[in-house]
Amino acid sequence: MDLFCKIDKVEIKTNPENQKFDIFYKDKYKPKKKEDFLINLNIINKLDSIIENGVSNFFISGQNDVGKYTLAKYFIEKYFENPCIIRKYTFVNNNKELIYYKSIYHYELHIDLHNCNIINLVQSFLQYIVRPNNSGSNKNVILIKNVHLLKPEILNLFKIYLDKYYNNIFIFIGKKF
């Protein structure tokens, strides 16, 4: 009795229509609808009313791991009515690198202790991503994560951009100051 068999090389054919994008574990189980959230629904209702009444800049603050980033992503996906799939990019200016994330609809800057505190680099990056004031239906969304780690000079730079480029939506996420 032969217990071994020969297996020829098999090619797996994927259907590109069914494989639109990779789904990570965290993306698969994150809340997608208002009812999926496990937090106070008043917060979600306020976000929905911000979208309905016209969007402005806002700051989401709280302790670690309470869902600030998830709320911001919910807001962006609800605002553009599409899922946001982000990719990692590198912005280079004067031999300094700044890593950021971008989707079709928005930009994300994740701040840590080692980046984003060089004012010329951040200013060049903001000049690169902000949209001038024009009459478009949707605004350009820029999400800044861990804003509490920024130096005061960089925060003042963001204030200038908030005042000057009002056709952009800045979402700041961080701990309370």
Which positions does each model-derived feature cover?
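P-loop/Walker A NTP-binding region and its immediately flanking N-terminal helices
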Residues: 1-176
